[in-house]
């Protein structure tokens, strides 16, 4: 039986990547720092995944073990030495942390097992595997870099599946939406293509990453930030508000124009894709908390992320002003959550310098740019019309 090493035993790791690895015939070793989850994995050796829908289909995942990377670093190294594939679902900020363990494992692997290995970062970001590779290679001696490039692939991936916040009777069980997408860049794979059910291998990943980021993530941000501003608790509740409905269709029309111009997507097919995405947010069987989806506003207001980049692309390709994307950016600037470190930091910036300067600082936009002016205009409208 093939072995997969997966970093991140959270809901996404178990409910999305772990499920597909099992369905592909892998035994999976979950690596995490959460001792309770790792203990339960080793105790139960299986868990259930439920598809959020009327029938709540139940799927069982077997052949799993867990390693606490803090308590058993040598076991992590040994697992990487013997692995057939390595995947991650830890969050973008944790990739530099796990890179040290992966680097150590790969260095030991070159001594014991001279076979190729692919490491696929399944993160909500552009270029996750490439970033992970940079951090893995940081600790290498110069003469080892060529060998690592020859043996180890870091193909970038685009992943998409809504896994809401949840509390289940069994700690390991997880509910996910039925829809998923996992696209991997084929040209960066070393050796044989990993035979994983559900992966679509493509030659050029960029269009798929940006289509997902600027449709799914952009779209999800709208009921999250506007929903919070308007007093809603869940995405499903927020999606019933006509003001939010109007904004999401408008914003995804703007980001869609940018994507069609940039990558030549078929207009009719892209509109069908947008409609499917909006229907996912309206799924009554997934109750996702608006504040969970909205967390990390500084990262999400970044120059290359889901709100600012499609807005700038829209301006560049059409010469028009992205009203609905600007409105969403404004709502993100208003987001306040005492349990979110980035939200606290953002509000401190705003208190110190004002909304305009804070936006300029986190987005990289000029203070007199078209987008900045429109964002501040929309922000004032939101403040006055709540």
Curated annotation (Swiss-Prot):
Q: Which GO terms describe its cellular component?
A: cytosol
The entry marks the following residues as binding NAD(+), namely: 4-15
What reaction is this protein's catalytic activity?
A: D-mannitol 1-phosphate + NAD(+) = beta-D-fructose 6-phosphate + NADH + H(+)
Q: Which GO terms describe its biological process?
A: mannitol catabolic process
Reported EC number(s) for this entry are: 1.1.1.17
Write the record's keywords in alphabetical order, separated by commas. NAD, Oxidoreductase
Domain of life of the source: Bacteria
- Per UniProt, what is one GO molecular function of this protein? mannitol-1-phosphate 5-dehydrogenase activity
**InterPro entries annotated for this entry?**
6-PGluconate_DH-like_C_sf (IPR008927), 6PGD_dom2 (IPR013328), Mannitol_1_phos_5_DH (IPR023028), Mannitol_DH (IPR000669), Mannitol_DH_C (IPR013118), Mannitol_DH_CS (IPR023027), Mannitol_DH_N (IPR013131), NAD(P)-bd_dom_sf (IPR036291)
Gene3D superfamilies per record:
N-(1-d-carboxylethyl)-l-norvaline Dehydrogenase, domain 2, NAD(P)-binding Rossmann-like Domain
> Family per UniProt?
Belongs to the mannitol dehydrogenase family.
Record's protein name:
Mannitol-1-phosphate 5-dehydrogenase
Source organism per entry reads Oceanobacillus iheyensis (strain DSM 14371 / CIP 107618 / JCM 11309 / KCTC 3954 / HTE831)
